[in-house]
């Protein structure tokens, strides 16, 4: 069927459904709000699928259910249909003789997509499918738009994102994905709560952008006549709380970055950040390894997952490799001399078509080389450690080598999942790093951080030795659900206007 014919047919169906709704309005029963259900499909299947027909009939179990009518087969005086609720589907058996006069005729005029409430008794069909023999049924909500037909479905990716509500109705895989996402977040909370962390909320609007290298979204508070920035990270506020005595804190919330959109970047995304006093980046790596295994075991019951065709073993200890050594190990043709000196590193970057503005130092160039030449090769879980100080303005410098920091990033499936480090708690060193960031900003680096004087003041009151970490929830869900694009795991990703 051509598109124009599909549109014409859909418009005709909408018109017919509106006429049916008009009739119900005239009867005073368009949108009833007094139906109370007592059962969900999946719960009933879990308990009663195991019963044989005779045992189930003997129990005479009555249920009240509600859901969207997804299928229907009308066979004269009897019909089978499936209704779908938040947990699954249940078959219902509706007959003219089991309902009050006129109700069955009314039922036959309803449409797929309508939301109905039913009461009846559980039984098994000849094919042993758990079903409800209905003796009361009501139309609760009239659907004015038809569902996608069973042959064409809803496969257009952009339409799925724009009309996520429709995607969730017709695609069981989408419902399962976002249920899994909810489980991931719930298990993260349980994991941290059980270890004595306190969940907190910090501001979404900041007077200064900070806590990460990224371009912010700008806004304005009219009543206070004040320019503000949507937060790019909660880090500086969370560390203020550690100064205040909240020694183990975490936050799960949204971050906003005014940057490009890709399969791994959405301008609005969910981040877990957590901080612990009297801990180091080594402790954070051990905690991360435990958390990943906890999620795999509690949600999926496995220690091996498959991501984009690659089997990923979560049971083995996660190796650790410095950023410098990773460049060399994954690129045998590159020598230490090429990456240990500014000019040779710049030449190497140019060879791989990596832009290196004049204000880039050796540390920044090494990081760019790593991202271009190594990142996608990191399929199995690994911690990349000791990032250069130049790209780590909030990290504690390594005591043996001032060029690098006690920082790591966790990679799996060719993507960065987490970033953590021992925190810089020297206010004078932090102020100097902020000044270097200002120089970079003045040289054209739009992602460089601002100088946050109040944060320096907080450090001057004393931040205990602390380590912290941020984990991208969206990327973590991508990993566990085997999705290649971040938009697949965000309910309402940002899209261009039509």
From Swiss-Prot:
PROSITE patterns, alphabetized: AA_TRNA_LIGASE_II
Q: Name one GO biological process term.
A: lysyl-tRNA aminoacylation
Pfam families per the record?
Answer: tRNA-synt_2 (PF00152), tRNA_anti-codon (PF01336)
Note describing how the cofactor binds: Binds 3 Mg(2+) ions per subunit.
Keywords of the record: Aminoacyl-tRNA synthetase, ATP-binding, Cytoplasm, Ligase, Magnesium, Metal-binding, Nucleotide-binding, Protein biosynthesis
Q: Where in the cell is it found?
A: Cytoplasm
Residues bound to Mg(2+) 2: 416
InterPro entries membership: Aa-tRNA-synt_II, aa-tRNA-synth_II, aa-tRNA-synth_II/BPL/LPL, Lys-tRNA-ligase_II, Lys-tRNA-ligase_II_N, Lys-tRNA-synth_II_C, NA-bd_OB-fold, NA-bd_OB_tRNA
Q: Mind telling me which GO cellular component terms the entry cites?
A: cytoplasm; cytosol
Q: Which Cys-Cys disulphide bridges does the record give?
A: none
Specify which residues bind Mg(2+) 1 according to the UniProt entry for this protein: 409, 416
Per the UniProt entry, the Enzyme Commission number(s) are 6.1.1.6
* Cofactor requirement: Mg(2+)
According to UniProt, the reaction catalysed is: tRNA(Lys) + L-lysine + ATP = L-lysyl-tRNA(Lys) + AMP + diphosphate
Task: Write out the GO MF terms.
Answer: ATP binding; lysine-tRNA ligase activity; magnesium ion binding; tRNA binding
State the family it belongs to: Belongs to the class-II aminoacyl-tRNA synthetase family.
UniProt subunit comment: Homodimer.
What protein is this chain from? Answer: Lysine--tRNA ligase
- Per the UniProt record, the source organism is Coxiella burnetii (strain RSA 493 / Nine Mile phase I)
At the highest ranks, the source species' classification is: Bacteria, Pseudomonadati, Pseudomonadota, Gammaproteobacteria, Legionellales
């Amino acid at each position: 069927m051509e598109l124009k014919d599909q549109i014409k047919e859909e418009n005709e169906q909408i018109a017919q459904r509106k006429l049916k709704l008009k009739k119900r309005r005239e009867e005073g029963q368009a949108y009833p709000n007094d139906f109370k259900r007592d059962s969900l499909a999946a719960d009933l299947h879990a308990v009663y699928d195991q019963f044989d027909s005779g045992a189930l009939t003997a129990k005479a179990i009555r249920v009240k259910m509600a859901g969207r009518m997804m299928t229907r087969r009308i066979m004269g005086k009897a019909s089978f249909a499936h209704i779908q609720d938040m947990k699954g589907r249940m078959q219902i058996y509706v007959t003219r003789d089991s309902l009050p006069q006129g109700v069955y005729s009314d039922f036959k005029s309803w449409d797929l997509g309508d939301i109905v409430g039913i009461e009846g008794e559980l039984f098994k069909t000849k094919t042993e499918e758990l079903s409800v023999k209905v003796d009361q049924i009501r139309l609760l909500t009239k659907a004015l738009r038809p569902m996608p037909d069973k042959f064409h479905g809803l496969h257009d990716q952009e339409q799925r994102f724009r009309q996520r509500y429709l995607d969730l109705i017709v695609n069981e895989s989408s419902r399962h994905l976002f249920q899994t996402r909810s489980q991931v977040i719930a298990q993260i909370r349980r994991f941290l709560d059980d270890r004595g962390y306190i969940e907190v909320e910090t501001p979404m609007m900041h007077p200064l952008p900070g806590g990460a290298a990224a371009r912010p979204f700008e806004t304005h508070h009219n009543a206070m006549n004040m320019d503000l920035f949507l937060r790019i990270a909660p880090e500086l506020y969370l560390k203020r709380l550690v100064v205040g005595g909240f020694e183990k804190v975490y936050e799960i919330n949204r971050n906003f970055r005014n940057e490009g959109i890709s399969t791994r970047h959405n301008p609005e995304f969910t981040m877990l950040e957590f901080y612990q006093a009297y801990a180091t980046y080594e402790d954070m790596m051990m905690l991360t390894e435990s958390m990943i295994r906890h999620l795999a075991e509690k949600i999926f019951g496995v220690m091996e997952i498959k991501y984009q065709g690659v089997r990923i073993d979560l049971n083995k200890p996660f190796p650790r490799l410095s950023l410098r050594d990773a460049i060399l190990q994954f690129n045998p043709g590159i020598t230490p001399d090429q990456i240990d000196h500014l000019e040779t590193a710049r030449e190497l970057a140019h060879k791989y078509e990596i832009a290196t503005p004049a204000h880039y130092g050796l540390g920044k160039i090494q990081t760019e080389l790593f991202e271009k030449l190594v990142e996608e090769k990191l399929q199995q879980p690994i911690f990349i450690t000791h990032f250069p100080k130049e790209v780590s303005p909030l990290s504690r410098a390594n005591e043996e080598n001032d060029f690098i920091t006690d920082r790591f990033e966790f990679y799996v499936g060719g993507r960065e999942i987490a970033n953590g480090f021992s925190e810089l708690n020297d206010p004078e060193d932090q102020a100097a790093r902020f000044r270097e960031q200002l120089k970079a900003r003045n040289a054209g680096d739009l992602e460089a951080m601002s100088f946050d004087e109040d944060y320096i003041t907080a450090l001057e009151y004393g931040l205990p030795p602390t380590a912290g970490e941020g984990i991208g929830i969206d990327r973590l869900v991508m990993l566990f659900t085997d999705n290649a694009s971040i938009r697949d795991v965000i309910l309402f990703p940002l899209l261009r206007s039509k």
